[in-house]
Curated annotation (Swiss-Prot):
Broad class of where this protein is predominantly found: cytoplasm
Gene that specifies this protein: ddl
PANTHER family per the UniProt record, alphabetical: D-ALANINE--D-ALANINE LIGASE, D-ALANINE--D-ALANINE LIGASE B
Subcellular location: Cytoplasm
Taxonomic classification: Bacteria, Pseudomonadati, Pseudomonadota, Alphaproteobacteria, Rickettsiales
Catalytic activity as recorded in UniProt: 2 D-alanine + ATP = D-alanyl-D-alanine + ADP + phosphate + H(+)
Pathway per the UniProt entry: Cell wall biogenesis; peptidoglycan biosynthesis
Protein name, as recorded: D-alanine--D-alanine ligase
EC number(s) per entry: 6.3.2.4
Function: Cell wall formation.
Amino acid sequence: MLMIPTIAILSGGFSCEREISLMSGKAVKKALDSLSYNAIEIDVDSNIAEKLKKINPGLAFIALHGPYGEDGCIQGLLEILGIKYTHSGVMASAVAINKVMSKHIFRSLNIDTPKGYVISREDVLKNNIKIDYPYVLKPINEGSSIGVYIIFSHEDYLELKDNSSTIMEKMIVEEYIPGIELHTAVLLDEAIGTIEVRPKNKFYDYEAKYTDGFAEHIFPAKIPDNIYKMTLEHALKIHQFLGCKTISRSDFRYNPKNNTLKMLEINTHPGFTELSLVPEIAKLAKGINFNELVKIIIEDSLQHKNIRDLSHVEQYY
């Protein structure tokens, strides 16, 4: 009889995305219960190593987001403890969450990305910004659009300055790309589809991502066929180059006025609630429901023996 391993669902954690992570964890727990897995939810804190040693799970389902969860930290701990885990490994996670590093890699692979640079808090407060309006100011290592500001005018800048406590010591400032918001899902080394998001707010922010009715989703995205194909190619290319595992989501902006596609980032641990984009794309593109998607992730993750294998980079060297 096949032994079903205990699965530890890691959620919560220390980042600004804690609440999102808890939502993801509960959604995964509900799915695993319905699939008859023995699943235990763990709210990650400084005692996580001791908790994991006590439970000794056969697999850790990483439902964490942001720093310590999708940046290679928890992955490194699980490597040391010898526990298999879902999603990408240490290197892919660490590089993907860092928007500066990932943009360098996009360019090295001839994937176009918005122009920008790292800026200090001091320069932001002095309005010493070398990019004209409109521009985007965002954290280097965050997700879920937390701490992202689109500055269309000097009035927007003054409003940002009035809320200066949200400005980090180091951030990225980059050109704003008008047009269409696109998100591409990769599952099991296949780019399965691209969805278009039309937020009711100025952009696809935290509220739009996690509140039903705050954004319109269109699948497949209503863009030219060659651009749609390009989103699939770029998403799969960066997924494979970084050695991402099982699942990822790449984000783009498409400007129909000049027919340009820009890659914004790749997410190795995309949101995993009932409202999240990857589960939606999986359902619409492949007919895979949420429970089935969780099962696919579990089964694929259990098959990986050498999580730290770097052989995927040989073809690019």
